[in-house]
Amino acid sequence: MIEKKTVCQIVEEWLEGKDYFLVEVTVSPDDKIVVEIDHAEGVWIEDCVELSRFIESKLNREEEDYELEVGSAGIGQPFKVLQQYYIHIGQEVEVVTRDGRKLAGILKDADEEKFTVGVQKKVKLEGSKRPKLIEEDETFTYEQIKYTKYLISFK
């Protein structure tokens, strides 16, 4: 069986000097290898093909047959690595917390321990007749959330 660690090392070698980053590698018991990469400006098919060929050049099909799939992390998929938070700062995201809260807002900041989202809330201010829309920052640790993902908007 092909080891995940081996595939990760091959991918990291290809990534050197590039702005791409590794999101996830999975290797199933029947040697189906799935590699997900990402980039701040999106993933190009030509780069997926190049990475696929690079991996194939490092693995020996004669020794062990495998199926290989290389692609992007997916625009509507939950974030899996910290770099995905970094590249989406300033963009709208959806956050679902472990206690079931679901909110959408602008990703303002992220570091290794937490991230901050600016959320629009209706608040009735003293002396006003109608609630006003205000933005409030909410900060979460990664342990508090079920998932965060880029919110696709068709506005």
Swiss-Prot record:
Compartments where located: Cytoplasm
An annotated GO BP: ribosomal small subunit assembly
InterPro entries, per database record: Ribosome_maturation_RimP, RimP_C, RimP_N, RimP_N_sf
Keyword terms: Cytoplasm, Ribosome biogenesis
Keyword Glycoprotein: no
Presence of the UniProt keyword Cell membrane in the record: no
One GO cellular component term: cytosol
Family listed: Belongs to the RimP family.
Function: Required for maturation of 30S ribosomal subunits.
Stored HAMAP family: RimP
The protein's name: Ribosome maturation factor RimP
Species per Swiss-Prot/TrEMBL record: Bacteroides thetaiotaomicron (strain ATCC 29148 / DSM 2079 / JCM 5827 / CCUG 10774 / NCTC 10582 / VPI-5482 / E50)
